């Protein structure tokens, strides 16, 4: 496929090593702006979203002096970010914390290809939420469906755990294999959160007001990923991801 050249910044290995070795801050607010000066009334250089990592050049008043990967510099209000190592000490990897983050995105609109708090598709929601917890996993639902421990879902859902990923799509037939086209995060009590039109909670239980018959009928299986964190190549905290550790 193709991407706008202005949307990426090419780097050599040496440049990537320098970027990774530099002090960084992580955006902790849903979104914020980088300004030309340490003054929120000055012109904006760029917007940034949750989990963005920026090079830390210094501090000025209540602002971080930061650099973007393309070399632009500006000032980010400190209230919207934390130094990388300090942020890592605050991040949790348990299911309930991850579900709470997913719920905080409730109402965010669906956008195909979206991978930020501005808009997300189904797998983009999963990836964005986990990135906000310093975890990287594959981008697309069809890729995520191959990661972790495969779970054939019991009729009463009793073998599912909060934090499992639940997958939907076309069921397998004698002629064709199953085709994954949707994913959500299981919350427990037969409920899951996903991005379909917008981010919201649905239920497999016909007695619940959030009952989702459409998705129940196309439910395929689940994948358990959190116990496999940093034990399999596809699910890692970012301090173990090769991209952030170019040698």
Identify the meaning behind each predicted range.
Residues 1-33, 39-101, 108, 199, ...:
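Boundary regions of SH3-family modules and the immediately adjacent low-complexity/disordered segments
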Residues 10, 40-42, 179-182, 186-247:
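Aromatic- and glycine-rich peptidoglycan recognition patches
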Residues 19-35, 131-146:
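Short, basic/aromatic beta-hairpin or loop at an interaction surface
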Residues 38, 105-110, 129-137, 170, ...:
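Sec/Tat-exported extracytoplasmic proteins
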Residues 85-89, 109-117, 170-173:
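Second-shell loop/turn segments in exported
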Residues 102, 114-133:
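Active-site nucleophilic cysteine motif
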Residues 103-114, 144:
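Short, flexible active-site loops
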Residues 137-201, 207:
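...with weaker cross-activation on analogous glycine-rich loops/strands in unrelated enzymes
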